[in-house]
Amino acid sequence: MAPPGSSAVFLLALTITASVQALTPTHYLTKQDVERLKASLDRPFTDLESAFYSIVGLSSLGVQVPDVKKACTFIKSNLDPSNVDSLFYAAQSSQVLSGCEISVSNETKELLLAAVSEDSPIAQIYHAVAALSGFGLPLASNEALGALTARLGKEETVLATVQALQTASHLSQQADLRNIVEEIEDLVARLDELGGVYLQFEEGLELTALFVAATYKLMDHVGTEPSMKEDQVIQLMNTIFSKKNFESLSEAFSVASAAAALSQNRYHVPVVVVPEGSTSDTQEQAILRLQVSNVLSQPLAQAAVKLEHAKSAATRATVLQKTPFSLVGNVFELNFKNVKLSSGYYDFSVRVEGDSRYIANTVELRVKISTEVGITNVDLSTVDKDQSIAPKTTRVTYPAKAKGTFIADSHQNFALFFQLVDVNTGAELTPHQTFVRLHNQKTGQEVVFVAEPDNKNVYKFELDTSERKIEFDSASGTYTLYLIIGDATLKNPILWNVADVVIKFPEEEAPSTVLSQSLFTPKQEIQHLFREPEKRPPTVVSNTFTALILSPLLLLFALWIRIGANVSNFTFAPSTVIFHLGHAAMLGLMYIYWTQLNMFQTLKYLAVLGTVTFLAGNRMLAQHAVKRTAH
């Protein structure tokens, strides 16, 4: 540990938390992400569609394809003048390639104009209108708008509506595009919110990105601010840039288009504020360095950064406010060394100004200022319980170990006193973790106590063997005393071997060896005690109940004897005999179930008896019916 009075060293650890004013971006394109996106778009052309995604996607990122002439030749050689989609890809691609002009015949022009019809799907109308616009051919915007509006009534999917927005951005500004613009609000209502951070269509990221790009392109075209809240824009941004690797060209193209729209439109430019360097950078001076950029990690040239206020996270006291950052290269810096902040956490509220388009431009930064802790006034004492002998006190200086041993027994207590100070400022410190650990040199047993400061911030630990015997299991011996100091804001956590302490407990309270030896011996067997069966009713009650149950049967026999039983139609055919025997067997099975069987056993037997009885009874009744018909 550096001695007191050494030069101050601050440790800045920075994290961004959500601003209370607005949602903070959690995803954006870092410089590495932008290069990865460019690599995803820079692929060999396989057809006109892939060429369109590569050429226009790279153009959105401000990059030309490596070989413009070769790309133009590929477009011309693969163009099908009789296909609207082919014409769309060629027109949009050639438009961003310098010096790539494609001549169009009258037949092709008529083909494109004919495709702008309410009988065509919206995708076809979009491709035709964009192709006419790309080739610089005249277009009746009102007629195209009428066809587009008519088709919107028939196609209500999210994709069709987004393509309608894309189409409208190619129409004349004099056309009444209000109905198309109103579709933006309807699309926003169809977005799904995830955890208050993300906003997307259930169709996925690609369509969400195309919606953002189409919305801002159309709003720039008509000169109207989009009907989206700032938080919704940030949620859409978080969704679009949450993915860093792309499986298809079309997905990479959609993300590039959305990134260009969010960084260059006339209404909303999300601000990305990133602390420079790692969150564990050590600085010789207390300097907060911030990189301020758009979603493409491009520096905002017009930005002006200002500290609104800095508050202690513990006390909420304001320690700094209304302080501008200075621009050094592309980094904004705030030097607050002169403020001499004590160690701890501080909440810095930073605002980016300079352009009315900036959104998410107020962020909260959690700044951790670390320091070094010093241990002073360390006293080790043995205090007589009867106070008949004056305390023996020994002062120790960190990191040395106290000479000799200290004794704590039934006659005297052991005490440790110390103070913790900030090495850089001399201020008193109260770290979160201040422990005293006693380690038995023979058995390895460890006992840990918390050291608490008093009202003067003097830490005290006192060991009374009569009160602490439970924690030690009354195990006497020589213990090594360690002092442990730790805190998230401390640069130098401390583990200090302070002294050796001999602790003696009364012999009769020594730890039981029987307990330790019996840990792995068989335990006494646990005998399960079943619940006593419930008392059965007296035999008289049971017999009376049985007689009542059988009384209807006795009555039946008595009536048969008196009026006679009609058995004239009884035959001794096999089906008749089997039916009656089966019926009797089922009644007998019920008795056996009552006395011996369980439900599942009974059901198996009953299934066999029931099947035989049913078949025999069915045969018996059929024979009886035939016999009655014959008579």
From Swiss-Prot:
Cytoplasmic side: 562-571, 618-631
Protein name: Dolichyl-diphosphooligosaccharide--protein glycosyltransferase subunit 2
InterPro entries with a match to the protein in the record: Ribophorin_II_2nd, Ribophorin_II_3rd, Ribophorin_II_C, Ribophorin_II_N, Swp1
Record-linked Pfam families: Ribophorin_II, Ribophorin_II_2nd, Ribophorin_II_3rd, Ribophorin_II_C
Entry membrane topology: Multi-pass membrane protein
Family under the similarity heading: Belongs to the SWP1 family.
Cross-link (Glycyl lysine isopeptide (Lys-Gly) (interchain with G-Cter in ubiquitin)): K154
